[in-house]
Amino acid sequence: MLDKLKESLRNSPVIKKGEYDYFVNPVTDGIPLTEPELLEEVAEEIVRRFRPEADKIICIEAMGIHHATVLSLKTGIPFVVVRKRRYGLPGEVAVHQMTGYSEGELYINGVDSGDRVVVIDDVVSTGGTLLAVLEALREMDVDVRDVITVIDKGEGSRVVRERTGFTVKSLVKVDVIDGRVKVEDIPAGGPHD
């Protein structure tokens, strides 16, 4: 299971961003080449394991977009993108995010009080992006049904759970050891389900 995902992760180059070990992968960066079979495998496993039920899928720019697109096509659930750019639309909510290697503003549009949503992103690492978005959605009185990432790296999922009460569900857990990506399965029914 998830053979393409695991192989792509194990073959990922690792670079340093300050003190942060950053792996470069099609799932998290769109480079090297993102094969459609990889996206298909990831989306099928998300649907199989987590069976998203919601009015909307919320993804975070930029690397959540391709996962939300494929998931939307598989489930028939429309998606909306939390953007890094302000549009000034009525009801727009600005969110300040801090990660292990950057900080900035995100903007939520097209999400209303009472909406039932699934939040999807490529990876949870420090938890900074998910924390900011989930806290904003809570303030907006949005019904967050699930929080799903393809990859769990570091302590971010624990931080998100402790600070928001939401369990981040992921397909695999990774760690960077001696400049290489190590991949660990998270079995269905495992700690994130």
UniProtKB/Swiss-Prot annotation:
InterPro entries per UniProt: HGPRTase-like, PRibTrfase_dom, PRTase-like, Pur/Pyrimidine_PRTase
GO molecular function terms noted in the UniProt entry: guanine phosphoribosyltransferase activity; hypoxanthine phosphoribosyltransferase activity
E.C. code: 2.4.2.8
Subcellular location: Cytoplasm
Keyword list, A-Z: Cytoplasm, Glycosyltransferase, Purine salvage, Transferase
SUPFAM superfamilies: PRTase-like (SSF53271)
Family matches, as CDD domains: PRTases_typeI
Catalytic activity of the protein: IMP + diphosphate = hypoxanthine + 5-phospho-alpha-D-ribose 1-diphosphate; GMP + diphosphate = guanine + 5-phospho-alpha-D-ribose 1-diphosphate
Keyword Glycosyltransferase: yes
One of the protein's GO biological processes: IMP salvage
Gene3D superfamilies from the UniProt entry: 3.40.50.2020
Catalytic EC class: transferase
Domain of life according to the entry: Archaea
Protein family membership: Belongs to the purine/pyrimidine phosphoribosyltransferase family. Archaeal HPRT subfamily.
NCBIfam families: HPT_Archaea, PRK02304.1-4
Function per UniProt: Catalyzes a salvage reaction resulting in the formation of IMP that is energically less costly than de novo synthesis.
Protein's name in the database: Hypoxanthine/guanine phosphoribosyltransferase
Species assigned in the record: Methanothermobacter thermautotrophicus (strain ATCC 29096 / DSM 1053 / JCM 10044 / NBRC 100330 / Delta H)
